Regions:
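Non-catalytic substrate/cofactor recognition surfaces at enzyme active-site rims
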Residues: 1-142
Length: 142
C-alpha cells in the first residue's frame, strides 16, 4: 500500500501498519521487507560513522540473514509495501556534519519518516522468522 508522506512519520509522529512475511518453499527461505532495507541490516557490517545524528552502537543486530535457516536465504525488498529506505539507526544522518565526509545528507533518510522504523522492522522480522521456524518444527515433529 502507498503511504502518504504528509501523514507518515515526522513531524506528525504518526504510526502506520505494514506487513512483513517469512516464507519457506523447499530449501528456499524468503523474508519480505516493506521498504528498501540497507544491505548491512540483512548481511551484517553496520557501522557507527562519525557525524551520525544518533550516536549509538548498531541496533539492528544480529543480521537478518544469520537468523534464516534455509539452504538459500533471500530478502525481497518492497514486499507488500513501501515505507521508505530502512537505514541502520546508527547511520541516520539528516543534519551536518554528515557521515563519511559527505557534503550533503545521504540519500535514503529523506524517504523515511522516522529513524525508529529500521529497528522496528528488524525486530519484527526476527519475530516473524522465529514464528516460521517454530511452525516448521511443529510440522516436522508430527
Amino acid at each position: 500500500g502507498a503511504v502518504h508522506p504528509g501523514v507518515y512519520g515526522l513531524p506528525f509522529n504518526t504510526k502506520i501498519r505494514s506487513e512483513i512475511d517469512a516464507i519457506r518453499i523447499g530449501d528456499i527461505e524468503i523474508l519480505t521487507t516493506p521498504g528498501e532495507i540497507f544491505p548491512e541490516i540483512i548481511n551484517g557490517g553496520i557501522e557507527t560513522p562519525k557525524g551520525a545524528d544518533i550516536v549509538t552502537e548498531p541496533v539492528e543486530v544480529p543480521p537478518l540473514r544469520q537468523s534464516m535457516t534455509g539452504v538459500i536465504n533471500m530478502n525481497f525488498n518492497l514486499g507488500m509495501d513501501e515505507v521508505g529506505y530502512l537505514a541502520p539507526i546508527s547511520q541516520w544522518d539528516r543534519k551536518p556534519p554528515y557521515t563519511y565526509d559527505y557534503q550533503e545528507a545521504p540519500y535514503g533518510e529523506i524517504y523515511v519518516g522516522n529513524p525508529e522504523v529500521s529497528p522496528l522492522v528488524h525486530q519484527t522480522s526476527l519475530e516473524v522468522l522465529q514464528r516460521l521456524h517454530q511452525t516448521l518444527a511443529s510440522i516436522q515433529n508430527r
